[in-house]
Amino acid sequence: MSMNNIPQSTTLSDTTAGTSCFDANHIDVTTIEDLEQVGSDKWTRYPGCIGAFIAEMDYGLAPCVAEAIEEATERGALGYIPDPWKKEVARSCAAWQRRYGWEVDPTCIRPVPDVLEAFEVFLREIVRAGNSIVVPTPAYMPFLSVPRLYGVEVLEIPMLCAGAGESSGRNDEWLFDFDAIEQAFANGCHAFVLCNPHNPIGKVLTREEMLRLSDLAAKYDVRIFSDEIHAPFVYQGHTHVPFASINRQTAMQAFTSTSASKSFNIPGTKCAQVILTNPDDLELWMRNAEWSEHQTATIGAIATTAAYDGGAAWFEGVMAYIERNIALVNEQMRTRFAKVRYVEPQGTYIAWLDFSPLGIGDPANYFFKKANVALTDGRECGEVGRGCVRMNFAMPYPLLEECFDRMAVALEADGLL
């Protein structure tokens, strides 16, 4: 291999690890027009609308990531992903997992274009056509649609909202319906989707909840697909615990996938990771998932390694900004939008808003037409999503204020607030 193709991540991390370079003031003055000029789907699909549907942030790139991408393009490192970069991704991902107290063997980590590709391998190779999978709802939309492409039946099991009433409640909490889950397992379902932190409700599971799930899985020989892409986005009072890290039983049950794409806003670079703590899964992966690795982008491996190695300080700046935003969301839902059902997220940068108490059957369409706000239709997240929307609040703070203003004006005009 030539010198130009040897990973340069160590040098990059040495120069960037100690500086944040996250400029909140710059984010605050970013306009809709500025974001449309960037050209993302989030801000160009519906011109003039506030984009609050696609789950990506509007905070630019960490300097270490931008520098790594620039250097890679200058030296023409845009070919198929070579083994040295696969190993760098594994090494840096394993190092990042230590944030959660998880010591992972890098040889268990393989590159994949995105978490959904990992999910597809799980469906194809482990669940297999003719079987079923439990998906707690509301759910990330593809978890409901993709299994059917592989002949796998989706069993929607609605989450329970403990303490939910007609208005927001700071003590409300989302819970798994373990009785319904066990019934599904007893009836022959052998797979479960665990999204933690959960998209779209923002729940962060406790160790005790995951142990209860694991014990049920052990009783009925169930495998767990663990999507942990939102792991860094956890608010004060809550802790992300990787499912596979708890004990040997969970490690053998888990098929974990994660990525730097949410934390560092690089989903378009196409590099996620699958963490295979069950040796049989690793053997299966090496035998049957070669083309999934082959589709992983070299530029994504470079960006991911730079992010994991050198982006921690920048990400802390991002989290401080998002915590300011979630404080605004919580305040708005307690005051102007008190009639809307809402449970404060424990993690992620996504809020789940239930407008059914206001008699709005299709709030996504309502706010798109009456407020120029683009939200995700809750029905895409499962049967329980009727009357609900998913809101991405990882945008400039002033635009988030404007988003709520637009929505409130529309509702007030119709006498609904």
Regions from the language model: what does each represent?
Residues 2, 182, 250, 366-375, ...:
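PLP-dependent enzyme catalytic core of the Aspartate aminotransferase-like
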Residues 4-13, 248-323, 331-332, 409-411:
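Conserved core segment of the aminotransferase class I/II
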Residues 7, 15-114, 121, 307-310, ...:
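N-terminal small-domain helix-loop-helix segment of the aminotransferase-like
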Residues 77-215, 232-233, 240-249, 255, ...:
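Conserved core of the PLP fold type I
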Residues 105-106, 344-349, 386:
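Short Gly/Ser/Thr- and Asp/Glu-enriched loop/turn motifs at secondary-structure junctions
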Residues 150, 219-220, 250, 371:
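Helix C-cap/helix->beta junction micro-motif
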Residues 305, 321-330, 342-354:
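Conserved glycine-rich beta-strand-loop-beta hairpin in the small C-terminal domain of fold type I
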